[in-house]
Amino acid sequence: MTPKRALISLTSYHGPFYKDGAKTGVFVVEILRSFDTFEKHGFEVDFVSETGGFGWDEHYLPKSFIGGEDKMNFETKNSAFNKALARIKTANEVNASDYKIFFASAGHGALFDYPKAKNLQDIASKIYANGGVIAAICHGPLLFDGLIDIKTTRPLIEGKAITGFPLEGEIALGVDDILRSRKLTTVERVANKNRAKYLAPIHPWDDYSITDGKLVTGVNANSSYSTTIRAINALYS
């Protein structure tokens, strides 16, 4: 029997972003929880980034944001999570036909590379065309800007409903002016540009995720578990 396999994408960007000079990159909580959930549901999980590199968002490191099993999995060198991270692939090394689910994790680093990550977009579109699922969380839907449905040659999210981190959340974090000054986009703008319907949560920190066919999106790290479960359910629907 062919094993069930999921591919989690990471942003390759790891550079200065915050006003205090701290770097952004991958939001560790999102990938810890999605990885754990996939594994507990019988999936083999691999990580990929556009360049094969990644770094952690320095404002959201484990000491403040995780505990219990998540913390143990992050800090244990030979945990399944860290072993998978050590095998991270560049996007051009990945065979899309090996996977049933593409899961775009985020962190503010995704603002910089996801909209132009052509190889990641190519993998996601092929998985979707083969009957697989595309899921994205928080800033992950920025990958949809330029992602094409192979069968229609139209934007893959056109006519579909998506969610993702809202501008209200950027304002609450005090980074909305950084987005403006660096000409970085938002999930809602990507939705509008590609003729999708953006559905906002009542509050930016709510656990909120939605499914539209084989497309699944979640609004923040608190939605990691529900988004992953929706992706698994969508695969078998």
Curated annotation (Swiss-Prot):
Keyword flag Hydrolase: no
Mutant lacking the gene: phenotype: Results in higher sensitivity to oxidative stress, reduced thermotolerance, accumulation of higher levels of reactive oxygen species, and reduced chronological life span.
Swiss-Prot/TrEMBL keywords: Cytoplasm, Lyase, Stress response
Reactions catalysed according to its record: methylglyoxal + H2O = (R)-lactate + H(+)
Top-level taxonomic group: Eukaryota
Main location: cytoplasm
UniProt-annotated location(s): Cytoplasm, P-body
EC number of the protein: 4.2.1.130
GO MF, any single term: glyoxalase III activity
GO biological process terms on file: cellular response to nutrient levels; methylglyoxal catabolic process to D-lactate via S-lactoyl-glutathione
Keyword Methyltransferase annotated: no
GO cellular component, one term: cytoplasm
SUPFAM superfamilies: Class I glutamine amidotransferase-like
Family the entry assigns: Belongs to the peptidase C56 family. HSP31-like subfamily.
Function as written in the Swiss-Prot or TrEMBL entry: Catalyzes the conversion of methylglyoxal (MG) to D-lactate in a single glutathione (GSH)-independent step. May play a role in detoxifying endogenously produced glyoxals. Involved in protection against reactive oxygen species (ROS). Important for viability in stationary phase. May negatively regulate TORC1 in response to nutrient limitation.
Summary of subunit composition and partner proteins: Homodimer.
The protein's name in its UniProt record: Probable glutathione-independent glyoxalase SNO4
Gene source species: Saccharomyces cerevisiae (strain ATCC 204508 / S288c) (Baker's yeast)
Encoding gene per record: SNO4
